[in-house]
């Protein structure tokens, strides 16, 4: 009878775990005029990015500034990974990012795994996940070379205006670079380390979606999943086992395929299935950051393109570190 009562109470609580509808984008104080681009314009924007990056990585330091100015505005604003962080202007871009990268990896190649585009509010954007591969032959970011092949996981979002990129967000997984360079400096990952694989059942680069409703539906599915994360059973005084069951039966469940893969950055790792995601990352993360706000800042990017969607915050999360459950640090 007590077990039956527990199940009834559990189902009763689930009825009230409704996904709240709210704006997930950046909080803005000025009126802006939304832009919408056609599928053909979106395809051309993606080709513009692919072709120019292919030229830059092909020629490397040969005519570098000229090649960069074919795609980037001279006053480009760059938001980068630690320790490069934020800076402006094409000369800073060359000095801080491109020259050190090409010096350290003289044969570096770029392989796109996913590239998608769209518009969000008043911004036209193209985003990608790519792998930058090359022999590590000279120091990079203060790390001595190990003279081995390195695969850098790289995620980018570029804002395009007047046929030039005016702002870029570039995140290279530096912790994974350290791992491959034999410089592991943190606790072991809960998940599995290694490459992030390309899409399993579709081409993530050379696709063209004419039906804008499909792209919008892909984005809305992702945003609904994002909003579901604001439901926080860890705020209640419950056991770890009960929290696990609550997360497995959380409203997020409606948005994940049974064989889903969650690719986390190095230090966290990759997990398979919702149960694996809960065990390897979500449950310990929620216990460590029970006091957190996903939406105090909001997304600067929300785009859908065919089967794919892309959201991003800069920065994404404000939280209080409350326990060592997640990565084991006091």
Question: What is each of the regions a protein language model found here?
Answer:
Residues 1-330:
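C-terminal and inter-domain tail/linker signature
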